[in-house]
Amino acid sequence: MDLKEFIKICHLLYDRKYVVGSGGNVSLKKDNLVYITPTGSILGFLNEEDICVVDIAGKIIKGKPTSELNMHLEIYRNKPHVNAVVHTHSMYCTAFSVLDKKLELYTPEAEIFLKKIGYVDYCPCGTLELAECVSSCNEDVLILKKHGIVTLGSTLTEAYIKTEVLEEIAKLNHIVMSFDK
């Protein structure tokens, strides 16, 4: 499988500061296989050979996958239209998740790409509880309380664009709120 786009998306997430350090993870489903970032990896420094491979049942074929593997697998098992998952801890979205504030979709772009944002109550990172809460949501754009965001798409590019638009709309919400004082 050609993983050039996968690596490009990981590098973009890091370069644009949607992830820092070893935070965040990315996966792509192709047939019965899931290509996923390794645990503890820095997305900006990943190469194709670093990507882990797991089957949809959870059997590890290659590497040591992210601690959020269960979340990715549960999403794929419960949402057949999803082939890509991006999970980040972007600054503005995470700040709003900590404050438990809902975002307004102020722009046409946000309405088109995001449609509706789902909000997930706090669940500990890497747990089956988090995996079940996230995978049971109807929305493809999710804000996880005190944690970050998850965006879903039929392609990695689609999931990435949702991440980018969501962080921009969070920045816009912050600006609007500061003017409103």
UniProtKB/Swiss-Prot annotation:
The active site is at 68 (proton donor/acceptor). The keyword Plastid does not apply. Gene3D superfamilies: Class II aldolase/adducin N-terminal domain. Its EC number is 4.1.2.17. GO terms for biological process: pentose catabolic process. Homotetramer. Substrate binds at residues 24-25, 39-40, 66-67. It comes from Methanococcus vannielii (strain ATCC 35089 / DSM 1224 / JCM 13029 / OCM 148 / SB). GO terms for cellular component: cytosol. Its cofactor is Zn(2+). InterPro entries: Aldolase_class_II_sugar_metab, Aldolase_II/adducin_N, Aldolase_II/adducin_N_sf, Fuculose-P_aldolase. It catalyses: L-fuculose 1-phosphate = (S)-lactaldehyde + dihydroxyacetone phosphate. It is an enzyme of class 4 (lyase). Involved in the biosynthesis of the coenzyme F420 which requires phospholactate produced via the aldol cleavage of L-fuculose 1-phosphate and the NAD(+)-dependent oxidation of (S)-lactaldehyde. Catalyzes the reversible cleavage of L-fuculose 1-phosphate (Fuc1P) to yield dihydroxyacetone phosphate (DHAP) and S-lactaldehyde. GO terms for molecular function: L-fuculose-phosphate aldolase activity; zinc ion binding. This is L-fuculose phosphate aldolase. Keywords: Lyase, Metal-binding, Zinc. Zn(2+) binds at residues 68, 87, 89, 147. Pathway: Cofactor biosynthesis; coenzyme F420 biosynthesis. Belongs to the aldolase class II family. AraD/FucA subfamily. Binds 1 zinc ion per subunit.
